[in-house]
From Swiss-Prot:
General function of this protein: Nucleobase-proton symporter that facilitates the uptake of nucleobases in the cells. Can transport adenine, guanine and uracil. Contributes to uracil import into plastids for plastidic uracil salvage which is essential for plant growth and development.
Outcome (variant: residue 227 to D): Reduces uracil transport activity 10-fold. Reduces guanine transport activity 5-fold. Reduces adenine transport activity 2-fold
Tissue: Expressed in roots, leaves, stems, flowers, siliques and seeds.
Protein name stated in the entry: Purine-uracil permease NCS1
Name of the encoding gene: NCS1
InterPro entries associated with the record: Pur-cyt_permease, Uracil/uridine/allantoin_perm
Major site of localization recorded for this protein: plastid
Alphabetical list of Gene3D superfamilies matching this protein: Hydantoin permease
Outcome (variant: residue 342 to A): Reduces adenine transport activity 5-fold
GO molecular function: nucleobase transmembrane transporter activity
Keywords on record: Chloroplast, Membrane, Plastid, Transmembrane, Transmembrane helix, Transport
Reported impact of residue 223 to A: Reduces uracil, guanine and adenine transport activity 2-fold
């Protein structure tokens, strides 16, 4: 037995926040509309469906029972308030007349999602899942900011020659700049309840979305390894002195570290998986309850350095070692590195904002980023500067500093603080995005837990102990290097969502493999996005190869481009994408204007 059904939905170009639920009769003037048809076929062994845009036209109310669409007229299939205008600007029946199933406020039916493109971790969030208040979002950022890498980044700027105030100014400036793309990228996550991998489908294509999500996942795996290594160092700090002086603590040349330190790394690696396995709710609770503890422990460290150094006057007496010209030469790559520090989260922030109660909650919660970064940077810079007075040399690594302080109580507090700070940062910042990327790659096989496990395994492959061997390799090779990958992705996604699609997404088509789907493009790939991505990366490659000593001599222009990799790659990729898509849009408009609407 074979059955089929056809349903039509009108998508109006109205701002989603200007209208709540109104009847069709509330329309007062001419507006643009898109007519979509959804056709499904079902027999005893197979079910298939597709959704396509039939036509775009004007809709104008003529009377209470008569409406004009382009050159055609119609009367509502269901009278009165049975036709409603949802917040996303979709005219639809309250219930699907054909199937009897409830249609979502954004005009889609989850039962029509292609099973190869969705599972429980990829579906749009429901109202009951949206539990993140502004306080939860702020707590998330406190947990992310208060950590060893943030402290180490601030200390690295002093270590490279900056004065304390120059280091803080660099960090705060970078995070104020970052706040703009952070809030802009979070908006579709909250509005539509979709994660970063699903949002990427709108610009890169249904299958092409694997490219940006896997690149983001790769960076996340590297960061996961770095954070886990730091947590392992905290365990190493707890070990008795005679064990740390044993033969097991000798570095193996082929490994790049000692068997003892590597074992501590693996122990912490295993401990994190217990929390990761609980999913997003476990992460939210961890961040919320850890925030006050981390603030208290950070305050204790600042108080200790204040007393030991003899006050802020002595703590902050370390002046800049740079001339004016040398400072500006260091400032711009340092600014890029600091923006790159959280550029990973700026890209996949929809993974978190999709759980926010409202746009207000996500915006207010994220404004805390530059504030928290400024405060914690002050702690990091002040304590690092004080070490030159207390110990006679600058110690930018907090784990090394805590080892120098000594004492059982200090050691225990250090273990708790470093472990908690590492867990809150690592799990939220470096597990969620790679895990979701792997789920998006193969929803039938990967769950969030399985994706997190593979992320952890790849974190070992990155050999984080080598990335942390010096301030220069951490700032110039790692942070700036990966910004060349993330910058163009961010530029493409933001240009597509705000300039090309005007914040309007067809959620049903984001989960459809139909060739007529809006985001199927060419066999599931948007060639324009791929070309723009390559265009954004290529100019940075020579500078990166020079930095890792693969190229001996390059033009000074390539050095400047690499030092500002995030800005150049973001702007170039976004501009190239806008040019290509604008030209394609004009061609499509000319084709559609010569055809007749199918009504």
């Amino acid at each position: 037995m074979v059955s089929n059904c056809l349903s039509l939905s009108l998508h109006l170009n109205l701002h989603p926040h200007k209208h709540n639920r109104h009847s069709l009769s509330s329309l007062r003037s001419r507006t643009k509309a898109k007519l979509y048809q959804h056709v499904s076929f079902t027999d005893s062994s197979h079910k298939s469906s597709y959704t396509s845009c039939v036509s775009t036209f004007d809709i104008q109310r003529k009377s209470s029972k008569h409406y004009e669409l382009g050159k055609h007229s119609f009367s509502p299939i269901l009278p009165g308030d049975n036709l409603v205008l949802s917040r996303s600007g979709v005219i639809r029946p309250r219930l699907s007349a054909m199937t009897g199933s409830e249609i979502n406020d954004h005009g889609y039916d989850e039962s029509q999602f292609d099973p190869s493109l969705t599972n429980d971790d990829l579906k749009p969030t429901t109202p009951s899942q949206r539990t993140f208040s502004w306080l939860d979002m702020s707590s998330l950022w406190i947990g992310l900011v208060v950590g060893v890498p943030t402290y180490y980044l601030a200390g690295s700027l002093v270590d490279l020659g900056m004065a304390w105030w120059q280091g803080i100014a660099t960090v705060v400036t970078a995070n104020l700049i970052l706040l703009v793309p952070l809030v802009l990228t979070a908006q579709p996550g909250t509005l539509y309840g979709i994660s970063f991998p699903v949002l990427a489908r709108s610009s890169f294509g249904i299958r092409g979305a694997h490219i940006p999500t896997l690149l983001r996942a790769l960076v996340g795996c590297g960061w996961y390894g770095i954070e886990t290594w730091i947590g392992g160092e905290a365990i190493f700090l707890l070990l008795p002195g005679h064990i740390k002086k044993s033969a097991l603590s000798h570095t193996l040349p082929w490994l790049g570290t000692s068997p003892l330190e590597f074992s501590c790394f693996i122990v912490f690696w295993l401990a994190q998986l217990c929390i990761v396995w609980r999913g997003m709710d476990g992460i939210r609770k961890l961040e919320k309850y850890s925030a006050p503890i981390l603030i208290s422990l950070t305050s204790c460290l600042l108080a200790w350095s204040y007393l030991k150094a003899g006050g802020f006057g002595h703590m902050l007496s370390l002046s800049s070692k740079l001339t004016s010209a040398q400072f500006w030469t260091l400032f711009f790559p340092s600014l890029t590195a600091n923006i790159s520090f959280w550029a990973t989260l700026a890209l996949n922030i929809p993974d978190f904002s999709r759980f926010a109660k409202s746009q207000t909650d996500q915006i207010i919660g994220q404004v805390g980023l530059p504030v928290f970064m400024g405060l914690f940077t002050f702690v990091g810079v002040a304590v690092t500067s004080s070490t030159s007075i207390i110990f006679g040399r600058v110690i930018s690594n907090p784990i090394e500093l805590l080892g120098q302080i000594g004492g059982l109580a200090t050691t225990l507090l250090a273990i708790v603080g470093i472990s908690l700070a590492t867990l809150t940062t690592n799990i939220a910042a470096n597990v969620v995005a790679p895990a979701n990327a792997l789920v998006n790659l193969n929803p039938k096989f990967f769950t969030f837990g399985r994706g997190a496990f593979l992320t952890a395994v790849l974190g070992i492959v990155f050999q984080p102990w080598r990335l942390l061997k010096s301030s220069e390799s951490f700032v110039y090779t790692w942070l700036i290097g990966y910004s060349a990958l993330l910058g163009p992705i961010g530029g493409i996604i933001l240009v597509d969502y705000y300039l090309i699609k005007k914040m309007k997404l067809n959620i049903g088509d984001l989960y459809s493999l139909s060739p007529s789907g809006e985001y199927y493009f060419s066999k599931g790939y948007n060639v324009a996005a791929v070309v723009a991505l390559v265009a954004g990366i290529i100019p940075v490659v020579p500078g990166f190869l020079h930095k890792i000593s693969a190229l001996s001599k390059i033009s000074n222009g390539f050095v400047v481009v690499y030092d500002n990799a995030l800005f150049f790659s973001f702007i170039i990729a976004g501009f190239v994408y806008w040019i290509i898509m604008s030209r394609l849009g004009r061609k499509q408009s000319s084709l559609s204007s010569s055809s007749h609407p199918l009504l």
